[in-house]
From Swiss-Prot:
It is found in: Secreted. It comes from the Bacteria. Bacteriocin with antibacterial activity against C.jejuni. Its main location: secreted. One of its GO terms (biological process) is defense response to bacterium. This is Bacteriocin SRCAM 602. Keywords: Antibiotic, Antimicrobial, Bacteriocin, Secreted. Stable from pH 3.0-9.0, inactivated at pH 10.0. It holds the Pfam family Bacteriocin_II. InterPro entries: Bacteriocin_IIa, Bacteriocin_IIa_dom_sf. GO terms for cellular component: extracellular region.
Amino acid sequence: ATYYGNGLYCNKQKHYTWVDWNKASREIGKITVNGWVQH
């Protein structure tokens, strides 16, 4: 599986994508704290 950030993983062999919500909520929280300026 490939990890794309924000809790998102994709499995190319099996053609499915899933989200690790523990990771996602932490990373989204960091983005919120840092603001959207970096993007």
